[in-house]
């Protein structure tokens, strides 16, 4: 499919980088200047993405792809992702982030401290796209013109990524947020699930849905993005049991009473984590590290597994009490996963 035919959806920076990398390799090896390329995604969907420019020189080729954000109010919409390809002597694909791609300066993120902010999933996407063209060794350089300037208006600095944007994406597709049509889509999907199940599993994102699928039939799971509160309200009018399953960062917002977890609606993740950690009786030195962390992932590195379980049990219990106010006649359950997919807490299940 052509990505532009997905009227309200967009592509992630990772998908844009994968398309640019594939176009650059095709230019390098075949001297092709493609207007579009087709890339594989982690969810099995293949995307045909427009290519803005291909430049071919001796021993190197570069391609540019514009990020398309669909109906999302995204500051990265229209951003150019530029990839350059050249052969290397190995049989491996080496991916390097250059100007405009941020560097990781704190622990706790998916990328290792000191590396460029290109997620492991995106690295796999780029490799898979290139392997459709060649099995030769390739070096890919990813650049984002003005990425350092644009990054000043993102949340990157708050989580320890400096000097540019992050190249991210777990599916390659960017779903719309905060629009009534999206809620209608959720309502329709809930009705479909109800035909086969008397319960539903609400997962805010792709990782949560993936981890939840280890516990429940994947057809009983719905991904709702940031609209957690609205989705729970809709589900509670249709199902006898509603299960909220997610990762700590998203659910810590719900702990604070923020049911639309889009960044524009507020952020209390670390404050919530600190509050729950105090209630859990964590030592003062650990609390100090948590309050000074730049992300929940970093804060988790300062806690033992048992401490994480104790804190997340408090978080899950508070969330359960909040969502019960939506409909007291419904059986609600809250599951919080660790970042490796292990269940940290299950309350009401």
From Swiss-Prot:
Disulfide bonds: none annotated. SUPFAM superfamilies: CbiD-like (SSF111342). It is an enzyme of class 2 (transferase). The keyword Lipid biosynthesis does not apply. Its EC number is 2.1.1.195. GO terms for biological process: anaerobic cobalamin biosynthetic process; methylation. Keywords: Cobalamin biosynthesis, Methyltransferase, S-adenosyl-L-methionine, Transferase. Pathway: Cofactor biosynthesis; adenosylcobalamin biosynthesis; cob(II)yrinate a,c-diamide from sirohydrochlorin (anaerobic route): step 6/10. One of its GO terms (molecular function) is cobalt-precorrin-5B C1-methyltransferase activity. It catalyses: Co-precorrin-5B + S-adenosyl-L-methionine = Co-precorrin-6A + S-adenosyl-L-homocysteine. It holds the Pfam family CbiD. Belongs to the CbiD family. HAMAP family: CbiD. PANTHER family: COBALT-PRECORRIN-5B C(1)-METHYLTRANSFERASE. This is Cobalt-precorrin-5B C(1)-methyltransferase. The gene is cbiD.
């Amino acid at each position: 499919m052509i990505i532009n035919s997905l009227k309200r959806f967009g592509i992630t920076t990772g998908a844009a980088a994968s398309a640019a990398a594939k176009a650059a390799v095709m230019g390098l090896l075949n001297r092709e200047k493609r207007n579009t390329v087709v890339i594989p995604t982690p969810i099995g969907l293949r995307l045909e993405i427009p290519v803005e420019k291909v430049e071919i020189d001796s021993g190197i080729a570069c391609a540019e792809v514009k990020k398309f954000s669909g109906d999302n109010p995204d500051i990265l919409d229209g951003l150019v992702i530029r990839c350059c390809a050249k052969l290397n002597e190995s049989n491996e694909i080496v991916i390097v982030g250059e100007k405009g791609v941020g560097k990781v300066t704190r622990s706790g993120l998916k990328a290792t401290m000191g590396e460029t902010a290109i997620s492991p999933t995106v690295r796999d996407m780029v490799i898979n796209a290139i392997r459709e063209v060649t099995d030769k060794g390739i070096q890919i350089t990813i650049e984002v013109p003005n990425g350092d300037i644009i990054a000043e208006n993102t949340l990157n600095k708050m989580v320890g990524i400096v000097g540019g944007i992050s190249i991210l994406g777990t599916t390659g597709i960017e779903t719309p947020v905060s629009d009534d049509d999206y809620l209608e889509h959720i309502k329709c999907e809930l009705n479909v699930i109800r035909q086969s199940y008397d319960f539903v599993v609400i997962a805010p994102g792709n990782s949560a849905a993936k981890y939840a699928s280890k516990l429940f039939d994947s057809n009983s799971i719905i991904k709702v993005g940031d609209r957690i509160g609205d989705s729970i309200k809709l589900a509670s009018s249709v199902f006898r049991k509603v299960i909220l399953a997610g990762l700590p960062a998203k659910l810590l917002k719900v702990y604070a009473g923020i049911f639309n977890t889009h960044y524009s609606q507020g952020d209390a993740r670390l404050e919530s984590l600190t509050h729950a950690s105090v209630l859990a009786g964590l030592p003062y030195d650990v609390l100090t590290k948590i309050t000074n962390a730049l992300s929940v992932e970093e804060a988790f590195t300062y806690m033992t597994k048992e401490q994480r379980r104790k804190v997340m049990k408090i978080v899950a219990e508070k969330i359960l009490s909040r969502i019960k106010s939506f409909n007291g006649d419904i059986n609600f359950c809250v599951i919080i996963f660790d970042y490796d997919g292990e269940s940290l807490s299950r309350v009401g299940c």
